[in-house]
């Protein structure tokens, strides 16, 4: 049995398979996931697990060089935006329209669905390198 880190075997597998500049999505319960993208559904009930809790755990194992966030989060969910910035203080952020973010999920290795139910609580993580 695994003792530390992300316990979900699907998330662990996807993270281990990530290469430089690969994408991994993490987001709220309402995000439409394209059929061609693997969906890892962690939602148990509304709010559980939270977006930030899942993001923090993923970041313990994944090197991230850049993130993509919906432009709309600035006005529709500024509290979540601040939490994301606090969680990823030294990572470049690119704001894109929410419609574009949803389309970009087609090229993500996977999407991790949380129980989060606040608007625009979605991010695409771009994998970096550890050297």
Curated annotation (Swiss-Prot):
Active site per the UniProt annotation: 20
GO cellular component term, pick one: cytosol
Function: Catalyzes the interconversion of beta-pyran and beta-furan forms of D-ribose.
Similarity-based family: Belongs to the RbsD / FucU family. RbsD subfamily.
Domain of life of the native organism: Bacteria
Family annotation (InterPro entries): D-ribose_pyranase, RbsD-like_sf, RbsD_FucU
Organism: Lactobacillus gasseri (strain ATCC 33323 / DSM 20243 / BCRC 14619 / CIP 102991 / JCM 1131 / KCTC 3163 / NCIMB 11718 / NCTC 13722 / AM63)
Protein name: D-ribose pyranase
Quaternary context: Homodecamer.
Assigned keywords, A-Z: Carbohydrate metabolism, Cytoplasm, Isomerase
Pathway info: Carbohydrate metabolism; D-ribose degradation; D-ribose 5-phosphate from beta-D-ribopyranose: step 1/2
């Amino acid at each position: 049995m695994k003792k530390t880190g992300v316990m979900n075997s699907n998330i662990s597998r996807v993270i281990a398979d990530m290469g430089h500049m690969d994408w991994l999505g993490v987001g709220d319960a309402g995000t439409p996931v394209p059929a061609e993208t693997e969906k890892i559904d962690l939602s148990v009930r509304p709010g559980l697990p939270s977006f930030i809790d899942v993001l923090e755990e993923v970041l313990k194992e994944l090197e991230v060089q850049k993130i993509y966030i919906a432009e709309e989060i600035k006005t529709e969910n500024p509290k979540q935006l601040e939490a994301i910035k606090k969680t990823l203080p030294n990572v470049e952020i690119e704001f894109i329209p929410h419609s574009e973010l949803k389309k970009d999920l087609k090229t993500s290795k996977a999407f991790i669905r949380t129980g989060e139910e606040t608007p625009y609580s979605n991010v695409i993580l771009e994998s970096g390198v550890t050297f």
